[in-house]
Amino acid sequence: MGYMETYKAWCENEYFDEDTRAELKSIAGDEKEIEDRFYKDLEFGTGGLRGVIGNGTNRMNVYIVRKATQGLANFIIKEGTQDKGVAISHDNRRMSREFAQEAALCLAANGIKVYIFPSLRPTPELSFAVRELHCTAGIMVTASHNPPEYNGYKVYWDDGCQITAPKDTQIINEVKAVTDFNDVKTIDEEEARVRGLYNIIGYDMDDAFIAALKKQSLNGDIIKQVADDIKIVYSPFNGTGNVPVRRILRELGFKNVYVVAAQEKPDPNFTTLEYPNPEDPKAFTYALRLAKEVDADIILATDPDADRLGVYSKDTKSGEYKSFTGNMSGMLIAEYLLSQRKEKGLLHENGAFVKTIVSTNLADLIAKEYNLKLIEVLTGFKYIGEQIKFFEQNNTYEYEFGFEESYGCLVGTHARDKDAIVAVMALCEAAAYYKSKGITLWDQMINIFDKYGYFKEGQKAVTMKGAEGAVQIAKMMDDLRNNPPKKFGAWNVVEFRDYKKDECTVIATGEKKPTGLPESNVLYFELNDHAWCCARPSGTEPKIKFYMGVKGTGLEDADKKLEELTDAVSEIVGL
């Protein structure tokens, strides 16, 4: 059935409510809009669902959420784990509560017990709740840091980690097998409650979550020493972080926490934010203004579902606030935690440090410094969470720290997804520790570069929307795969890894070997002089990303080299 036939079927089928059909009929003369909404089904991929909110098969709406949930329910029933139940949470976005509720009622209609939070909660707390309640699965309704027109739906399994192979493919196949909306079950909330299938998660879960985070604190006594002097500015970006972040900082003894008022309360429109992403410097405009007013030591911001953290800190020399990349904040937390654990005799002899392949090579040197096994995984924090399960099952390593360049890390094993709440705690404690030594977080970052080398990373993302964009992205990847460049500007390619083919080619010898990682549409070019470039289409947005890294003799040299490598990449791919 073509997109126009599918569109007409939605307009005429009384399964869809009157408002939906009326809105669809209003676009009858706009064929391009109809095509974009109906040319494909919104893909339920390895990361779940992510798309623009609206009516149509290629949009996030209650019908698509129900259909995906029916597929998940069918899988759970085949696994025979429906009695363990499913935990559900959501963020502050438009339709988030409605989507969470629809998922809950679909599961209940299939005889699967549901535990749903009474209101918005962060992604890491959902991961924690799945483990705490011994559920078979979890659902988080969120589009993370995407623009306000987006929403999404992520699936977690019983270890609190987002689904990975082979279950991801098995669940995807079950979702695809639901082709008729009439096969999708639902039930009203009252009946679900009477049957004991619809349960509200109590506030004791919040208490347990905060208690688990506080176990990761290493220097509570030092916090008390500087509590009167250290000043923290925080923005939850109108999302889920506001309550848990303020609570944990208060309970740890921080007294001067200033919250950005315009970004404090839940706001699905993100009125003061063009893009609610801690990677975007413009998102810190309000926080920087407040920081200058109160003379803050550090500025922190969590994205709407509170799994990513952005950081600014004062530079003692200039007095200016400096921004940290996700690689920098990850390395700052790592060096603080590992040095303090070593000093206190808490480092494991068989400890492991986990990072994604597109994250900084500085991590390799920090892991070596603390005698940790460095493990690299594909892009996506679920692969870091999965490693913790492997460690436990095989009794191989003890998880010490894991991070990815996209502003996410996990301290502890209470959750199996990135956790900005515990990252806030770790960074504020680090700020207190270094303040007691007379330096700022930025000063300490420079100390880390002085110790290990001046690594610098960046990325270039190109958005290509709609059906045409998907074709362009695929062609760009095919060209790089079939005709891999031998040089990137002044850098020579030393090794070429095609993770889709599971093939690593050593350029000097022509030797080919497996990559050792699961199949993924990712191309990695290892260059000479510690430089590298990686290309991958985004799994959640209509864009292709190019990641790059260099090592310089100092900050300025690293900046210059990164600019040169970025220009070389742009020239190669025609951007």
Indicate where each model-derived feature is located.
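Glycine-rich phosphate-binding loop plus the immediately following alpha-helix
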Residues: 156-186, 327-350, 355-364, 420
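Short Gly/Thr/Asp-enriched flexible loops that form oxyanion-binding sites at enzyme active sites
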Residues: 99-107, 150-157, 307-327, 363
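Conserved phosphate/anionic-ligand binding catalytic regions in large, soluble enzymes, centered on
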Residues: 38-58, 143-146, 232, 236-248, ...
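N-terminal small/polar loop signature for handling phosphorylated ligands or for N-terminal nucleophile
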Residues: 87-150, 255-310
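Phosphate-binding and adjacent anionic-ligand microenvironments
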Residues: 292, 296-298, 320-322, 340-536, ...
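An N-terminal, well-structured beta->alpha segment
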Residues: 5-103, 191-228, 232, 240
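Gly/Ser/Thr-enriched, mixed-charge loops and adjacent short helices
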Residues: 11, 33-38, 42, 151-285, ...
